[in-house]
C-alpha cells in the first residue's frame, strides 16, 4: 500500500536582527527542525523556511549606535544568525530576510488588496513622542504599566504577562527607553486595518482546531470585546518599506514580518524551479502550512495574520504550534546571573546534539515553559545518550570487529525481540507528529533499557571466553546492533549527526522509516568510532561563566 506524500511548508518565527540568538530562541528552532526531519524521514515533502526580521526603529537605533547603516547591521546579523542556527543543525531550505524585494512586493500587494476591499482606513492619532530625541517612539521603546493587568515595566504594544495588546498611549506611567523622558503626545495620521471585519472568520478558524486548546481558549478571551482596528503604519524616521502613495509613512514591522514567510518561499522558488509558490499560498491550497511560534507572538500570528491572508486572497495556516519560554536553573535568563546563554557561546563549549536531545526530552504539545537545569542536563545526557544509547553499540561492536572481521550473523537469535521494537514505531511516530517529543524520547529510552538488559542477560564478554560459543557471541552482538539501528532511526530527527556516524559505522543506506523493518544480516560493518563524549560537569559549568 502506498501512501501519498504530504506536501508541507514549515516556518519558524524570524529572529530579530537586533541581537544574538540565545538558547531561548533555540527551543523553537530545534522543535521545528525535529518535526521537519521527522516528516522527511517518513518520506513526506517538507520545506522549511525562515529568515531575518529586519525592520523597525529598534534596528535603526541599534545601527546608529554601532555607526552602521541599517542594511549593514541586518547583513551582519543575518550572517551571525545563519551561523548559529546551522551550528545547532537547523537545516532551513531558505534563511532569507524581510528586507528584500520579494517582501516589499508582497507587502505592497497585500496592503493594496486590503485597501481595495475597504479594509484600510486613515485616522489621525495621538502618538508618543520623545521630546529629547525628537522621534516618534516605537512601541518597544516605551515602558510602563499594562492597562489590562497592571504588570509593571511592560512594552508599549504588548504585555508579556497577560498577552494583551494595546496602543502606547494606553500604557500607564510611560517613559521613553531612549532618553528616560516622559513622552509627550503628538498628532499624526496613521493607517489602520479593520480587524473587526474578520471577527466571524477568525472565530470560525479558531474553533476549527488549527490551534492548541490552550491557545484557542486564550484567543477567545480577546473576543469578549470588539477586536480593535490595527495600526499598520509608522512615521519617518523608520527603517522599513514605505507605504505606497503615502509620504513619510512606513509599514509597521509586524505587518511585513509574517509576510517574510511568503517572501522566503518566493525567493526559494527562484533558486529551485521545482518549488511552486502558488501551490503553498494560493487560496484553497491542498498543501499543509505550519507556523512554529512562541507564546509572546500568538496575537500577531493567530489574529492579524489569518485576517490579512484571508482579506488578500491567500490561504490560511493549517496549524500554528505555540511553545512556552525557556528558563535556566528555574529562573528567567539573566545576564547578571550568567544564565543569558547565547547560541554561539554554547557551541563554543558543547555539542549541539546534547541540547537538541535535552529539549526534545522536555518538549510536549502543551504551551509550557521548559527549564534548562544544568545538573539535570548533565545527568540526562550521560545517563540516556551515553549510558543507554551509545553504550549499546560500544558493547557489541568490538566483538564483531575483533572476532568476526566486522561481519554480522546471518540471522537474529531473538526475532521476536526485534519485532517488539518495530511494533513501537506507530506510537513513536504519533508522538513526533503531535509534538509530544518527551513521550517519544521516553519510549525510545525504555527500548534502550530493554536492549541493554538483553546484552546483560546474554553476557557476550563471558561467552567469548567459552569454547565453541563464537557463533552465539556473533548472534547476540548482531541482535544488539540491529536493535541499536532501530533506536538510531527513532532518534534520527533529534540526533542527525550521530545518525550519520551510525550509518557510516553500520555501512548501510540512510536510515528511515521505509527501511526500518529490514535487519542487517550477513553484512559487514566498519570499525566502531566513539559517537559521543561523556558530558563533564566542569564543561557544562562554562555555559554560565564567560
From Swiss-Prot:
Cofactor: binding comment: Binds 1 zinc ion per subunit.
Residue ranges annotated as motif 'KMSKS' region: 332-336
High-level lineage: Bacteria, Pseudomonadati, Pseudomonadota, Gammaproteobacteria, Legionellales
Main location: cytoplasm
Places the protein is found: Cytoplasm
Signal sequence, renumbered to the chain: none
Subunit structure: Monomer.
GO molecular function, one term: methionine-tRNA ligase activity
Function text: Is required not only for elongation of protein synthesis but also for the initiation of all mRNA translation through initiator tRNA(fMet) aminoacylation.
Any single biological process term in GO: methionyl-tRNA aminoacylation
Protein name: Methionine--tRNA ligase
Residue ranges that the Swiss-Prot or TrEMBL entry lists as coiled coil: none
Domain of life: Bacteria
Binding sites annotated in the UniProt record for Zn(2+): 146, 149, 159, 162
Keyword terms: Aminoacyl-tRNA synthetase, ATP-binding, Cytoplasm, Ligase, Metal-binding, Nucleotide-binding, Protein biosynthesis, Zinc
Reaction(s) the record says it catalyses: tRNA(Met) + L-methionine + ATP = L-methionyl-tRNA(Met) + AMP + diphosphate
EC number(s) reported in the record: 6.1.1.10
PROSITE patterns: AA_TRNA_LIGASE_I
Protein family (similarity comment): Belongs to the class-I aminoacyl-tRNA synthetase family. MetG type 1 subfamily.
GO cellular component, one term: cytosol
Amino acid at each position: 500500500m502506498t501512501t501519498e506524500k504530504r506536501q508541507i511548508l514549515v516556518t519558524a518565527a524570524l529572529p530579530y536582527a537586533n541581537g544574538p540568538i540565545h538558547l531561548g530562541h533555540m527551543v523553537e528552532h530545534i522543535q521545528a527542525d525535529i518535526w521537519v526531519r521527522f516528516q522527511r524521514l517518513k518520506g513526506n515533502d517538507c520545506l522549511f523556511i525562515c529568515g531575518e526580521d529586519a525592520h523597525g526603529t529598534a534596528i535603526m537605533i541599534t545601527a546608529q549606535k554601532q555607526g552602521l547603516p541599517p542594511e549593514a547591521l541586518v547583513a551582519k546579523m543575518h550572517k551571525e544568525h545563519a551561523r548559529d542556527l546551522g551550528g545547532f543543525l537547523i537545516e532551513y531550505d531558505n534563511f532569507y530576510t524581510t528586507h528584500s524585494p520579494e517582501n516589499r512586493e508582497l507587502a505592497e500587494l497585500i496592503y493594496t488588496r486590503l485597501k481595495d476591499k475597504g479594509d484600510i482606513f486613515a485616522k489621525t492619532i495621538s502618538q508618543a513622542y520623545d521630546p529629547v530625541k525628537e522621534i516618534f517612539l516605537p512601541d518597544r521603546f516605551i515602558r510602563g504599566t499594562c492597562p489590562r493587568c497592571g504588570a509593571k515595566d511592560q512594552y508599549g504594544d504588548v504585555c508579556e504577562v497577560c498577552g494583551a495588546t494595546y496602543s502606547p498611549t494606553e500604557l500607564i506611567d510611560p517613559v521613553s527607553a531612549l532618553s528616560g523622558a516622559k513622552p509627550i503626545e503628538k498628532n499624526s495620521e496613521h493607517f489602520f486595518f479593520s480587524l473587526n471585519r474578520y471577527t466571524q472568520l477568525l472565530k470560525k478558524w479558531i474553533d476549527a482546531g488549527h490551534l492548541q486548546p490552550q491557545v484557542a481558549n486564550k484567543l477567545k478571551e480577546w473576543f469578549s470585546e470588539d477586536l480593535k482596528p490595527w495600526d499598520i503604519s509608522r512615521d519617518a524616521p523608520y527603517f522599513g518599506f514605505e507605504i505606497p502613495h503615502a509620504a513619510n509613512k512606513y509599514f509597521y514591522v509586524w505587518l511585513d514580518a509574517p509576510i517574510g514567510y511568503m517572501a522566503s518561499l518566493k525567493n526559494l522558488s527562484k533558486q529551485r524551479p521545482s518549488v511552486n509558490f502558488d501551490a503553498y499560498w494560493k487560496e484553497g491550497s491542498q498543501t499543509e502550512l505550519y507556523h512554529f511560534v512562541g507564546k509572546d507572538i500568538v496575537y500577531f500570528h493567530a489574529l492579524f495574520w489569518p485576517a490579512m491572508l484571508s482579506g488578500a486572497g491567500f490561504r490560511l495556516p493549517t496549524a500554528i504550534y505555540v511553545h512556552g519560554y525557556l528558563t535556566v536553573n528555574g529562573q528567567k535568563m539573566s545576564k547578571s546571573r550568567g544564565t543569558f546563554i547565547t547560541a554561539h557561546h554554547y557551541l563554543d563549549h558543547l555539542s549541539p546534539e546534547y541540547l537538541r536531545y535535552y529539549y526534545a526530552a522536555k518538549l510536549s504539545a502543551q504551551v509550557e515553559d521548559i527549564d534548562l537545569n544544568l545538573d539535570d542536563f548533565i545527568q540526562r545526557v550521560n545517563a540516556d545518550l551515553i549510558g543507554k544509547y551509545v553504550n549499546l553499540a560500544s558493547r557489541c561492536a568490538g566483538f564483531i570487529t575483533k572476532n568476526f572481521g566486522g561481519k554480522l550473523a546471518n540471522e537474529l537469535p531473538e526475532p521476536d525481540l526485534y519485532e517488539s521494537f518495530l511494533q513501537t514505531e506507530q506510537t513513536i511516530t504519533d508522538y513526533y507528529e503531535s509534538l509530544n517529543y518527551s513521550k517519544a524520547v521516553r519510549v525510545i529510552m525504555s527500548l534502550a533499557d530493554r536492549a541493554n538488559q538483553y546484552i546483560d542477560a546474554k553476557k557476550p564478554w563471558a561467552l567469548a571466553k567459552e569454547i565453541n560459543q563464537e557463533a552465539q557471541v556473533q548472534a547476540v552482538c548482531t541482535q544488539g546492533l540491529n536493535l541499536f539501528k532501530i533506536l538510531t532511526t527513532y532518534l534520527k530527527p533529534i540526533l542527525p549527526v550521530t545518525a550519520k556516524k551510525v550509518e557510516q559505522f553500520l555501512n548501510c543506506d540512510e536510515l528511515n522509516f521505509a527501511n526500518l523493518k529490514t535487519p542487517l544480516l550477513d553484512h559487514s560493518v566498519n570499525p566502531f568510532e566513539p559517537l559521543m563524549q561523556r558530558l563533564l560537569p566542569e564543561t557544562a559549568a562554562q555555559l554560565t561563566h564567560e
